[in-house]
Structure formats: C-alpha cells, structure tokens
Regions:
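Hydrophobic membrane-spanning alpha-helices of multi-pass integral membrane proteins
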Residues: 19, 416, 442, 536-538, ...
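Membrane-interface interhelical loops and short amphipathic "cap" helices
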Residues: 1-10, 67-76, 137-165, 236-246, ...
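Hydrophobic alpha-helical membrane-embedded segments
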Residues: 56, 183-187, 497, 588-597, ...
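Aromatic-capped, Gly/Pro-kinked transmembrane alpha-helices
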Residues: 125-170, 643-690, 701-837
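Transmembrane helix-loop-helix hairpins at membrane boundaries of multipass inner-membrane proteins
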Residues: 1-14, 33-221, 225, 301, ...
Length: 837
C-alpha cells in the first residue's frame, strides 16, 4: 500500500468520511428490517464510525507523523520550559507552496504597474509589521504543509469552479481523529441510552393524547440514521477544500441538528427548539454568504489551497507564478513577507484609476482592508450562529430537548465545534480589526453564558450554558491572536464536555429527571458516573499545579488562553485589559457552577427519596465510554502527546508573528509565542489557579458544607437572580424585537391577502362566472345545444314516422316488396330509355 502522504491521506480520510454516509444510506432503506425493531441499525452505525476512527488513526500515526516532523511545541511544554525556542524547520520535501510564493504573483505585478500609491502603502505597512515582528523575535511563518486536490468537478461557470475536493493538513487529521473518537463513544453510549426506542410501542410520558400517554412506534434505527448523517456532515466540513463545499456541509449539519434536536417531535418543546435552532442559524448563514461572495468576487476562487500535482507539489506557470492560487496565498504572498495584504484584485478598476488626493486614500491597504473586514465579519457571522455566540446564542440551551447523546455530540465534536474550526481555518483571511470583533463577541459570550449557568437547575442546561461560555473562550483566544490556544481548547473541551453530557445522561437515565433540586447523594448509587463526572469538572475548570506540567487537559488549554489575553493586554494596554479580566472572572464562574452541579447531584442528602431509591448505575455500554473519555479528559493535553506540536505544524501562513491594524492603527495582535514569556506564565498561571480555587471554594461553602443558604442568597440578590434566571431576558427581548413584529407583519399580510387579494380573486371569479353564464345561455344553450337538440328531435320524429310502417302485418310487407320491385323496374326502364334516346 502506498503510504506517501499525497496519495494515502486523501484516500484514508475520504474512506473515513464516507463510511458514516454508507451507514446512513443503508439504514435509510432497510433500517427497520435490521434485526428486531431495527436493533442492528445501531450496531451498523457504531461499526461505521469506529472504522472511520481507525482509518483516521492510520492517517495520523502511519502516514502523517512518520512523514512530518513535529516542531518544538510551546503550548503544554510551556508549563515546564521557561525559555522560548524557535520553530523547527519544516521538511523541505513537504513545504508546499513556499518556493512558488517567492516568485512575483500576477496580482502584485499588476499593483506595481497600476498603483504606485498602493505599493507605497504596502511598503509602509510592511515596515510597521516587520518592526513588530522584530520586537517579537519571530518572522512570519511560511505556508504550512498541506495537501490539496479535487476528487470531482461539478462544473465551471466563468471564473467559478465548483468541485468536491480536500484540504488536508495537521489540523484536518487531528480533527478527524477527535471527531470520530468522540462520535464512536457517543454511538456506543447511545446503544444503551436509546434502548427504550426498541420497544414497540414506545411510551412517551411527556406527551398526553386524549388523556393518555403517547404510544408510538420506536425510532431506534432512525436515531442512528440521523447520527450517521450528522458525523458525515461534520467530517465534510473538516476535509473540505473550498468555501462552497464548506457551505454545503455547513447547511447539512444544520439540517441534521434540526432532525436530532426535534427527534421527539411530538413534544411541543422539542419541535419548537428544532425550529429555533434552524431559524437562528439561518440568520448567521446570511452573513456568511455575504462574506463568501465578497471573497469570491475579489479573489476569483473558492479554493483554500494552491493547485498541486499528484506528488503534492504546487503547480507553477512557465514564469514561475502559481498556476491556480488559492485564497490564502493571494492574501499572504511571499513578496509581502506572508503578511495580510489585500491584492490589487480587491480594489475595483475604476477606483484604482481615480486620481488620489492622498496616498492613503488610494491605497489598497485602506480600501482593501475594508473589504477584508466585511468578508471576515461575514464569515464570522456564520460561525456566530453555529457556535452559539452572542447574540445568536439563544438556540443552544433549547437544543437540550434532543436526546442526551445528541447533546453530547452537538456540544463537543460536531455542530458548535464547526464554528470555531471555521474561524481557525479562515484565520489567514482575518484582518486585525476582524479579529477584534471576534474577541469582543467571544468575551461577551463567555461572561454572559457563565452568569446564566450559575442559576440554572436543569443539569443539561447548566452544561449547555457552560458550552456557550467555553466557546466564547475559544473565540476570545482566536480574536486575540491565540490561534493555537483557541484550537487547543477546542480539542480538549470536546473530550471533557462530551464526558460531562454523557454523565448527565447517565444520571437522567437513572432518576428520570433533569432537575438538580430533585437529586442529591447519588455518588453512592452511581460511583462510576459520579467520579468520571468529577474528572470532567476538574478538567473544565483547568485543575492543575501552577507552573508545572501536572494537571488535567483544561489546565493546559485554558491557561494558554489566559496567557494570550495577558500578552494582548500588555501589548495594547488601556481597555484591552478587559479581555483578560473577563477571562479570569469567567474561569472563576466556571469553577463555581460546575462544582455547584456536582455537589447538588452527587453529595448531601437525597432531596427526592423516591427517585433516589430507584437510582442505579448505568449499564456497561454507557459507563464504558465514560471511563474512556475520562482518561482523555485527563491526559489528552499532556506535553508527552505533543498535541500542540500538531497544531503548530498547521499554523496558518503568516500568522505566527502577529500583526498590526490598518483601520485601527494602534491595534497590535501580538505573536502567540510572546505569551510564553516567564513573567506572563507566572502571573497568568497564578491568576487562573486562584480564580478556579475561589469558584470551587464558593460552591463548596454554599452547596457542600451549607454555610450559606441558597434560598437566602436568592432573596438577598433577588433582582440579579431574577435577571439571570430569565437568561438576561434575551428570549423576551427577541420576542419583542423580532418574533412579535414578524407575527404582526404576518397577520397584516394575511389580512391583506384575505381582504384585498382574495376579494380581487373572488371578484374576478364572479365576473368570469357571469360571463360564462351568459355564454352558456346564449351560445351554448341556444345555438350549440339548440342545434344538437333540433337534430335529435328531427331524428326522433323521423323515427316515429317510420315506425308507423312497421305494423308487423305480413301482407303489408309483401305489398311493400311488390311495390319496391315495381318501382325498381320502372326506374330501370326509364333509365334505359333515356340512355337510348
């Protein structure tokens, strides 16, 4: 078998991607016939996703790692090593695109010929960025190793090429392993959790029909059918080689989430939640379309990478230029030191030909950056919807109406992860001003969701708001220049958040309630669930020993985010310290609400003895995945596993050295390696540890030791509690601002339809009926029917006349024969006489 990366990786990952699709198709057509009540459909789906995971592991450990030497990592080891080391040089055989980018691109040549003011602006901006890079001690990184190609061409429409292709780098392979591993655990877990769906009929105790609980056929096979399609869609986003392909699978993920969130569609709450998720995400997708069109109209391509040959080498023209440059290489060329510089194609021809009053007014640096900002914010709008960021965060908590395995997958490895992943993938196209927007949205989201989680009593909703908050952390890190930190936390979060959701499902499966106020003392009844969930809680708060490489996975990734926030604030000063403050405060709130959840659920006296007496540990098919995920929640980020080395290997072109704003001139995005300075690590590590400790201590004081009464705290801070209990009134606000006006407009349109359009149509119908009545009476009735009826009447009368001769008398018939013969003879002789004469 050919294990060269350019050949093997597309085949292995394509097979891993298509296996869930094959499972979906088989279950779609024969799911009900796969065993009793479709039981074997679950095993088929599990086999498909586990096989996809194994293929992903082969791609990682047998192909990628042996052929691509990992650089010296700085995230993870930075808890142990104080000095900074430069990145290890990339393998010469796999540094695709670097040599090609050293040649002058057609876009740059055109800019040099047509706009000297643009060149002056580029050089001035380059000097600014190079000065900052020199301070950082780090040069802009060249393009990472990647493999790009097309499997199938759907067509060409002018400049637009629509293809099904791939873009494979270290991030792609890492995401494949993470998504398929967590999805495998969720699939196996669902075999036990969804076992009741094998009963026929299934009794839904939350739906009353005619005074009785709803009885319906089980939908076990349909659940795994949707789950397989969901995984296929997410993997399609990860492997996609162009923006159009990303958007197709982006929408397919939305459709799958609609099916899974509304799985119990007979429940009004579930169908409403599915509609809400679908509609809110379409709002973000509208912005994403604007960003996509802005990029395509100005760059003329949807492709991420440059065209490559069968060996994975960039295809060049005879002049040495890139034959078909992708988005990233057009925006970050070697001539500009791989910095983000809008190409001449981003400025309209007529704008470039206008005489400039000042150089900066005609420079592509300003006008092009505005277009880059629009494109970047547009793409980010889609990510805001998918990753439930403010102000489109309202759908994710309601998504808890779906089965718990769905929640575990949605909140960890698939839907919400897609938004953060896409920000990371498009990172080379984001200008510093767009990154600032991302950081602001992430900061608001992490603090807003954390405050709501403090008051929630539904165990799954606490975790849902926790997800929103943690996604805000990731967006904050990406917006502040921490590309590795943000995606590092995405991967670690996927493991401990899927663990936490599956533990909550285990609890719900045992006590048949989501309300934590009806739980308590379950540690004795459910020890495996309790302690694996404790591991998840410790991981999400970033528990670890400060300044040492000893800790849970969240310790490494969350500390990286706080360190980057500290570096950014230290570089920019002023109001930028607010990002750091909210990151630290958010860490404290995270520790508080997570241990509040654990204490209320597993410690103390039972609050509902009936539920406590019937509680039991979940079967092994459910606890097995919990133990496996707990191991990864502890160790996946340990320096020995070099996860950050993989991420550094995939770091987007030109982003390692940071950058500086053009529209906001005093904005500086610091190089990420600066956050590893010993003084920043010390202060950020102590701040993160102290904030988490304060949160855990606060939760213990109230919910473990009982020194403070929660009811008294609610009464003391009743206005604040009411605000948080009602989720900052966002649902009510959106109801007033959008839902009610939309319904009002709908009612007015309906009234106009009934009162004007329907009246006009009815009038037209009445007029047509009148005309048809006249025609029916005059033309049809008198002429057509009259003629036909007259002929019929004449025929009838003639028949009556002939009837008189039919008397039945034999003598009369003989007489008629004789007379007829006589007339015939007479006629014959008369004719002969005429002819002879």
């Amino acid at each position: 078998m050919d294990l060269t990366p350019a050949t093997a990786l597309p085949k292995l990952l394509a097979a891993a991607w298509l296996l869930p699709l094959a499972s979906f198709v088989v279950i779609l057509f024969v799911g009900k016939r796969l065993g009793p009540h479709g039981k074997w459909a679950g095993y088929l789906a599990v086999g498909a996703i586990v096989s996809a995971f194994l293929l992903s592991c082969v791609a990682m450990f047998a192909v990628w790692l042996p052929n691509h030497e990992l650089p010296v990592a700085h995230h993870g080891e930075h808890h142990e090593e104080g000095d900074h080391h430069d990145d290890a040089p990339a393998d010469d055989d796999h540094t695709h695109g670097t040599a090609a980018l050293l040649h002058e691109s057609p876009q740059t040549a055109q800019a040099d010929r047509e706009s000297p003011f643009q060149l002056a602006a580029f050089q001035e901006d380059a000097a600014h960025a190079d000065e900052h890079a020199a301070e950082a001690g780090h040069a802009a990184n060249p393009p990472p190793t990647y493999y790009f190609g097309d499997w199938y061409s759907l067509g060409e429409f002018g400049r637009l090429k629509l293809t099904i292709g791939y873009y494979i780098d270290a991030l792609t392979v890492t995401m494949f392993c993470m998504v398929t591993l967590i999805a495998s655990c969720v699939h196996i877990y669902a075999l036990g959790y969804m076992h009741d769906e094998l009963h026929d009929p299934y009794h839904d105790h939350e739906v009353i029909v005619h005074g009785h609980h709803l009885h319906r056929p089980g939908r076990f096979h349909r659940f795994f059918q949707y789950l397989s399609l969901f995984c296929f869609s997410m993997l399609g986003i990860v492997i996609a080689g162009n923006v159009a392909m990303v958007f197709v699978f982006w929408e397919l993920v939305g459709i799958c989430s609609y099916f899974l969130i509304g799985f119990y569609f007979e429940r009004h709450s579930a169908s409403t939640a599915a509609n809400k998720a679908f509609i809110v995400n379409r709002v973000g997708d509208f912005g994403m379309l604007i960003g996509m069109m802005a990029l395509w109209a100005s760059l003329g391509t949807f492709a991420f990478g440059d065209k490559q040959d069968a060996k994975g080498q960039t295809v060049l023209t005879e002049s040495g230029a890139i034959a078909e440059p992708g988005i990233f290489s057009q925006l970050r060329t070697a001539e500009n030191g791989f910095r983000l510089v809008p190409p001449a194609s981003m400025i309209a021809e007529e704008t470039r030909q206008q005489p400039a009053i000042e150089a900066e007014d005609a420079a592509a640096g300003k006008a092009g950056h505005w277009l880059l900002l629009i494109a970047g914010v547009g793409i980010f709008c889609g990510c805001v919807g998918k990753s439930a960021q403010f102000p489109l965060h309202v759908w994710l908590p309601d998504a808890m109406e779906g089965p718990t395995p769905v929640s575990a997958l949605v909140h960890s490895a698939t839907m919400v992860a897609a938004g953060v992943y896409l920000v990371g993938r498009f990172y080379p196209a984001f200008c510093p001003e767009a990154l600032l927007v991302i950081a602001i949205i992430g900061c608001i989201t992490l603090s807003l969701a954390a405050t709501i989680a403090i008051t929630a009593t539904d165990i799954k909703r606490v975790l849902a708001y926790s997800t929103v908050s943690q996604l805000g952390y990731m967006m904050l890190a990406l917006g502040l220049g921490g590309w590795i930190a943000g995606l590092f936390h995405l991967i670690t979060h996927a493991f401990f958040k899927s663990l936490l959701f599956m533990c909550s499902g285990s609890v719900i499966h045992a006590v048949h309630t989501n309300d934590m106020t009806e739980m308590g003392g379950l540690r004795k009844k459910m020890p495996i669930t309790a302690y694996t969930m404790l591991i998840g809680c410790l991981a999400i708060i970033g528990a670890g020993v400060p300044l040492t490489p000893i800790g849970f996975s969240g310790y490494f990734s969350k500390d990286s985010i706080i360190e980057q926030a500290w570096s950014h604030a230290q570089t920019n000063g002023g109001g930028y310290w607010a990002f750091l403050a909210m990151a630290v405060i958010g860490a404290s709130m995270t520790a508080f609400y997570m241990f509040r959840l654990w204490f209320m659920t597993f410690t103390g006296a039972p609050r509902d003895h009936h539920k406590y007496d019937h509680a039991h540990e979940s079967p092994r098919v459910m606890t097995g995945p919990l133990v496996l995920l707990a191991i990864f929640a502890i160790a996946v980020a340990w320096p020995a596993f070099r996860l950050t080395g993989l991420l550094e290997q995939a770091q987007p072109v030109g982003t390692a050295a940071g950058g500086s704003g053009v529209l906001i001139e005093d904005l500086v995005v610091p190089a990420e390696h600066l956050s590893h300075a010993p003084d920043i690590k010390l202060r950020a590590g102590l701040a993160a540890f102290s904030s988490a400790l304060i949160g855990v201590f606060g939760a213990a004081v109230v919910y473990l030791w009982g020194y403070l009464n929660p009811s008294e705290i609610k009464q003391t801070f009743k206005p604040i509690y009411t605000l948080l209990w009602n989720k900052w009134y966002f649902d009510q606000l959106y109801n007033i601002l959008f839902v009610r006006p939309a319904l009002f407009i709908g009612r007015q349109i309906a009234a106009f339809d009934r009162g004007v359009i329907d009246w006009f149509l009815h009038a037209c119908a009445w007029f047509c009926r009148l005309i048809s009545s006249v025609f029916a009476f005059v033309f049809d009735g008198a002429l057509v029917d009259g003629t036909v009826n007259a002929l019929a009447r004449w025929t009838w009368d003639f028949g009556l006349l002939l009837r008189r001769f039919q008397t039945g008398s034999l003598r009369q018939y003989v007489l008629f024969i004789v007379m007829g013969t006589w007339f015939m003879c007479l006629a014959y002789f008369a004719a002969a006489f005429v002819l002879m004469s």
